[in-house]
């Protein structure tokens, strides 16, 4: 992933709200904008997702290090990379088990991407998931660096019983 450009040279979108309703200023709104982009944060705190969040438009940098104070945490639903040329830096992901159990979706991973290329996940922490915390499989040119992937919820309602893993990655 050393040649990944993410949103370099594109538009800059500011996250000004911790809401997850897709309105202007939310992370969901910014991720839905087309074109090359960098997403910066003017707020800090936890974004409690109302549904799964897909990074489905590539050529994006999510710059969590721009958040003031204690930074940004994304919680309650999975975040999935479904595009190429994506950089995610200085973010926290906490799936938890509240919505997993309510939706009967014990295969959810906290964060990750499958079968993509040109990804960088840097200085992120991913924990409290009941399947895998971070899954990065079948990708090309992918770097996961300086990340903390830990504390899966082993006895938290998975259909296989005591089941949970920190990470799951490979080519």
Model-predicted regions and their roles:
Residues 1-39:
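Acidic Gly/Asp/Thr-rich repetitive segments characteristic of extracellular carbohydrate-active
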Residues 4-8, 23, 43, 56, ...:
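Intrinsically disordered, low-complexity segments enriched in small/polar residues
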Residues 10-12, 36-39, 44, 59, ...:
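A common structural microfeature
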Residues 17-18, 42-44, 65, 129:
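Active-site-proximal beta-strand/loop segments in catalytic clefts of secreted hydrolases
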Residues 30-37, 42, 65-69, 94:
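Generic N-terminal helix/loop capping motif
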Residues 48-171:
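Right-handed parallel beta-helix
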């Amino acid at each position: 992933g050393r040649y990944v450009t993410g949103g370099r040279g594109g538009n800059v979108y500011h996250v000004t709200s911790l809401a997850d309703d897709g309105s202007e200023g939310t992370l969901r709104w910014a991720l839905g904008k087309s074109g090359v982009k960098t997403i910066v944060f003017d707020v800090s705190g936890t974004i409690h997702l109302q549904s799964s969040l897909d990074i489905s438009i590539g050529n994006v940098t999510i710059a969590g290090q721009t958040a003031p104070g204690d930074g940004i945490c994304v919680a309650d639903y999975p975040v999935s990379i479904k595009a190429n040329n994506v950089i995610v830096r200085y973010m926290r992901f906490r799936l938890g088990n509240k919505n997993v159990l309510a939706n009967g979706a014990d295969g959810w991973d906290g964060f990750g991407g499958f079968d993509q290329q040109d990804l960088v996940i840097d200085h992120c922490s991913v924990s409290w998931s009941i399947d895998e915390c971070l899954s990065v499989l079948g990708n090309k040119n992918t770097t996961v660096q300086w990340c903390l992937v830990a504390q899966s919820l082993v006895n938290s309602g998975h259909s296989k019983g005591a089941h949970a893993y920190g990470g799951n990655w490979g080519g």
